[in-house]
Design a protein with these regions (language model features):
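Conserved AMP-binding/adenylate-forming
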Residues: 53-56, 70-115, 262-265
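Gly/Ser/Thr-rich phosphate-binding loop
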Residues: 185-191, 306-310, 324-388, 400
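Conserved C-terminal "lid"/linker of ANL adenylate-forming enzymes
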Residues: 502-507, 517-522, 532-594
């Protein structure tokens, strides 16, 4: 981009965000190599510690020895090029070994963390013969798989196969112990991880697959928190497309930073790419902590004092509410701090910024934008503008983001709301359903394949992306219900007594294609809805913005680490249907009396 050139009005052509990238970063290239080759650059010394897992340091030499054994064992079990390997593991070292081993043999990992029925469905579709599970896999679960799938080998990975229980604090041990069923899965079709590895060590006929960085490597289902769960497919090429653009994030030229990963499972693309592989590729020490209870993340932060810790709004809420965090606890150990997973409204941002200031963390709290389909992150916090009103940063250096008229390929100009679309090296190969892929991945007139996200937002003349809502939600009578702007209006009104608030948008059962807004508020002690209801309605300038009903919640509810809007929406619809049924019965009764 020529920074002195006049803007054409088309972000995809102007790329105004490039002015925020220093020259040294503009030279970043996306190499055409495997994930293993990309990581090997950081593994020149096999004695360097790559990961720490519950008291055990794991060197790069150990990592690649384990990968070799795992790849051989997979071939012994008959896993071939093109096969899908269902892996139902937490973020443990064995997951990384399996990912790199799958790459060596030309297979792909299949990850899902939904209901038992949905997980079984994924295995059925894959026609998998081998799956990997933890040792807290239950008898009831394995019997369901035996009845409904063609799996003939269940490889059982102990939760602490690579860790030391004695190194775990008591609260961690309790959290792990709570996962185990009364009757675990056992049988002639099960195999322990150690036996699996021994089988690989003995095998001498290993034949690696031809290198193909564009074949499927990682398949993961979306969480289903914003709609039906879909299988997203990525290759080594698309994974490295994200890693190469991000591996300077959270780094330091003065010391080797640590990177703590708590709880979040590798069933999420962002976890694998931006939270497991990124720190390894960036030369940081990855600390895996998958079995901590979400309400104990405050204790783990104090125990490890990490330099980097991928946060989500749920984690932020836990540490903010913590009664165990000393008032003088110093968070200056953090090198960068921000949150992804879902949008923050202005009230949430003010709350967390005040909290960080109280704990000597003088970093700028940032928010980013991304998706499973985008390979994780799509933006970075490079622009010096306030993180307010949906500001999620600027496109990554080799990615292009622009705004299009929804349902079309017509690019819009700056400050005009529309569908957020992107093109770049991190975009997925597609979904497992061709019709869904064709809708999401479209070749535009510029010859590039663009990902149509379904998200609504706009871009400023500086190239800063602002998110507004997910999809179009018109209200009958006029007006579009955009979640983030609605929440920010209430947040900026700073109504006395409100600690937190969020909207849930529900289909209008009387007007097809239209929607209705409901507001949930967390109130401070001593306040009731009567104290805030009129002020809420008064601050929303247009009638269509005002909620049908306002509910109170003791705290923000979460599902799959996101605000549980789907669950609350179902509750609203169920309550509405009950009221209709009751009204119908009353009407019938009145007619009988008459």
């Amino acid at each position: 981009m020529n920074e002195n050139a006049m803007l054409t009005g088309k972000p995809s052509i102007d790329r105004p965000w490039m002015k925020f990238y220093p020259e040294v970063l503009r030279g970043i290239q996306v190499p055409a190599c495997t994930v293993e080759q990309y990581l090997s650059v950081r593994a020149a010394d096999p004695n360097v510690i790559a990961m720490h897992y519950y008291g055990v340091d794991i060197t790069w030499g150990t990592v690649f020895r384990k990968v070799d054994v795992t790849a051989r064992a997979l071939q012994v079990l008959g896993v071939k090029q093109g096969d899908q390997i269902p892996v139902f593991l937490r973020s443990v070292p064995e997951f990384i070994y399996l990912l790199l081993a799958a790459e060596r043999i030309g297979a792909s990992l299949l990850c899902r963390d939904n209901t038992l029925e949905e997980n079984i469905e994924a295995v059925q579709k894959a026609n998998a013969k081998v799956i990997f599970v933890h040792d807290f896999f239950s008898k009831a679960e394995i019997e369901a798989y035996r009845e409904q799938t063609n799996v003939n080998t269940y490889v059982i990975v102990p939760a602490l196969e690579s860790g030391d229980r004695a190194a775990m604090p008591v609260y961690l041990q309790h959290s792990l112990d709570a996962l185990y069923p009364d009757v675990p899965a056992r049988g002639s079709d099960t195999m322990m991880w150690a036996d699996f590895c021994n089988m690989g060590q003995r095998f001498r006929g290993f034949v690696p697959a031809p290198v193909n960085i564009d074949r499927p490597l990682l398949r993961a289902y979306t969480s289903g928190s914003t709609g039906p769960s879909k299988q997203v497919i990525h290759s080594a090429h698309s994974i490295i497309g994200v890693l190469a653009q991000m591996n300077f994030y959270g780094a330091s030229d003065k010391f080797r930073p640590t990177w703590l990963l708590t709880i979040l499972p590798p069933a999420l693309i962002a976890v694998v790419v931006s939270m497991m592989l990124l720190p390894l590729a960036g030369g940081m020490l990855l600390i895996l902590d998958p079995f901590v209870d979400v309400y104990d993340v405050d204790l783990e932060m104090m125990r490890y004092r990490p330099n980097n810790w991928p946060l989500i709004p749920m984690f932020v809420e836990v540490i903010r509410r913590s009664k165990r965090l000393p008032a003088d606890y110093d968070m200056s150990h953090m090198l960068a701090i921000g949150a992804g997973c879902e949008a923050f409204n202005n009230k949430q941002l003010r709350n967390v910024e005040e909290f960080l200031k109280q704990h000597n963390c003088n970093l700028r709290f940032t928010a980013g934008y991304g998706s499973s389909e985008a390979g994780s992150n799509a933006t970075l916090p490079m622009a010096p503008f306030p993180v307010r009103d949906g500001n999620v940063g600027v496109p990554m250096i080799h990615s292009v983001i622009s705004i299009f008229k929804p349902g079309t390929q017509e690019e819009l100009t700056y400050n005009t709301p529309g569908e957020i679309c992107m093109t770049g090296p991190g975009v997925m190969l597609g979904y497992d359903r061709p019709e869904a892929t064709a809708k999401a991945l479209q070749v535009h007139a510029d010859g590039k394949t663009w990902l149509h996200t379904g998200d609504i937002g706009y871009m400023s003349e500086d190239g800063v992306l602002y998110t507004m809502t997910r999809g179009a939600s018109p209200r009958f009578g006029g007006g579009d219900l955009m979640v983030q702007p609605l929440e920010n209006i209430v947040a900026d009104a700073d109504i006395k007594g409100i600690k937190d608030e969020f909207f849930v948008i529900v289909p209008d059962d009387e007007h097809e294609g239209c929607f209705l807004p409901y507001l949930y508020v967390q109130l401070k002690d001593g306040y009731t809805l009567d104290d805030v209801r009129d002020k809420i309605n008064a601050c929303l300038p247009e009638r269509y913005m005002r909620p049908v009903e306002i509910f109170t919640v003791p705290e923000r509810p979460f599902f799959h680490f996101k605000t549980n809007r789907i669950g609350l929406s179902k509750e609203i619809i169920a309550k509405r249907n009950q009221q209709k049924e009751k009204a119908k019965r009353n009407s019938f009764a009145d007619g009988c009396i008459a």
